[in-house]
Amino acid sequence: MKRLSSILAATAVCAGLACTPMAGAAQLTPQQVAGNAAQSTLAPLEVTPELEQQTWYQKYKDDSRVEKLQATSPAMNGRKIPLAVIRAKDENRPTIYLLNGAGGAEQDMDWLKLSDAVDFYHSKNVNVVIPQAGAFSYYTDWVSEPNSQYLKGPQKWETFLTKELPGAIEGHIKADNHRAIAGMSMSATSSLLLAEHNQGFYDAVGSYAGCAATAYPVEHKAVELTVNRGGATAEQMWGPFGSPTNRYNDAMMNHEKLRGTELYISSGSGLAGKEDTFSYNVAKGYNPATAALGSARLQVEGGAIEAGVNYCTHNFKAKLDQAGIPATYNFRNTGTHSWPHWIADLKDSWPVFERAFNK
């Protein structure tokens, strides 16, 4: 029934003189999106002392399912970006670009450390590319260069992820021309933005517990707080509040550019679920003191963040509904801003991605 309503909504949009492609009809190739942009060069991962300390590397360094690579970014002065690539079992398979949240691998808060993404996606015979850098960057192109521990030098992540990397990596893994992009928390916003800025490039988008809006006062403050954690400012990233660059990087304002892309969008309510409780954490093996502190923090801090995300995401749904743009929504009655729910999203979004890839 959900799928039928989505089809009917899309059909209604096409009743006018012009009609955009049905959802999932990605048409552009990496070469078309790249234009004249210089391409990334791939090489085996150089294991620096910093990388060697990151849990994801220790966890998967001997796992043949995960190829450890680095890709240069010409737009970021040749910076070498570490990549974890979950390889499909076969050639000519789709590619998912999976983005970490604010702290990323740099803070040991990434998909490979904290989820079963490798087991899950390997079983689906799909390629997954995870950039293991980009903490606090929103994976966008910044207007000025910050100089902090996590953010130093040119930050041209959109250029890297959409123009420099796809041609190189998809050629290397012998992928087909189907692709999706997904992210959680900070990068849930990024996944929507990169799809909007490159219409027709992604078959599907997964936005797990993020906020589409960035150029409204309250939502912009949330962006500012996130970037501040990385030692930079939102003004360094997108210029002054309400500037053309800020508005360009507001997925709510530019929602029309998501038409024709399969969408999976989720949030919890902010109310504690079973995964946020003391007893759940004790059952997972944490000692009582750690479990008590963790559950209290999740229910207070994580609950407040997710309540804001829930408000923002319902506003986004209203905007998409008004425009007749179909999406698959997962609004949970409970759930804080935390990993158990993003791991569930990784799996719950797969039917949406699979449907898009099979068109």
Language-model features, listed with the residues they occupy:
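Non-catalytic cap/lid and distal C-terminal segments of serine-dependent acyl enzymes
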Residues: 2-10, 14-359
